[in-house]
Amino acid sequence: SKNTQPAGDVPNVVVYEDSQCPICKDYETQYGNAMLQLIDEGKITLEVRTAYFLDDQIEQTPNKKSSQRAAMAAAAADAVGKYREYHKVIYENQPREGVGYTDQQLRVDFAAKAGIAGDDLATFQKLYDTKAYADFAKKSFETMGEAGIGGTPAYVVNGKKINLESLSSNDPQTVLTAIQSAASGSN
């Protein structure tokens, strides 16, 4: 989709998140719409690097590897042009920590809520079922460690963490100011 690739003239925000992380859900709820507006206005670009370290840290019986499966599902949704919608649905339906996501949720229910249907649904489900994005998800997760990010959520620009928690407002201009401040190294 537009304005998702880094461009030299605007800040490129990199978000590290784990779909089972409750604080990631809070950040998505609080700052997600502002970030999307800034992307649509061409004021920032944004990359999401999905982690799945919580898969090893919390019991998820019987829904093992929930964060990894959600990361692969989100990548499959992107392949059919529905990343934004699917990403939003994942967080809107985040289970209580330790419960995890079922395959039914990830491949059927969330796809429907994100508006994936017809041939796109068949493509999405095939990509999910064959784990087509397993390597992509693994590489995305590995970038977190390579960047020295110790936990999620982390919003980073030019290698500097954006200090969102100190903001007085979550309106797009306030968020943009925080991004620009971090980008220039003055936060």
Predicted regions and their residues:
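Extracellular/periplasmic catalytic domains that process cell-envelope and extracellular macromolecules
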Residues: A7-G8, I39-E41, E146-G150
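Structural alpha/beta surface segment adjacent to cysteine/selenocysteine redox centers
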Residues: K25-Q104
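Extracytoplasmic/secreted proteins, especially bacterial periplasmic and envelope-associated proteins
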Residues: D26, Q30, A34, Q68-M72, ...
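Short pre-active-site segment immediately N-terminal to redox-active cysteine/selenocysteine motifs
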Residues: E17-Q20, G151
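A short beta-strand-turn-helix
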Residues: S1-V13
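Structural recognition of the beta-strand scaffold that forms the well-ordered cores
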Residues: V14-V15, T45-R49, A154-V156
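C-terminal cap of thioredoxin/glutaredoxin-like
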Residues: A112-N187
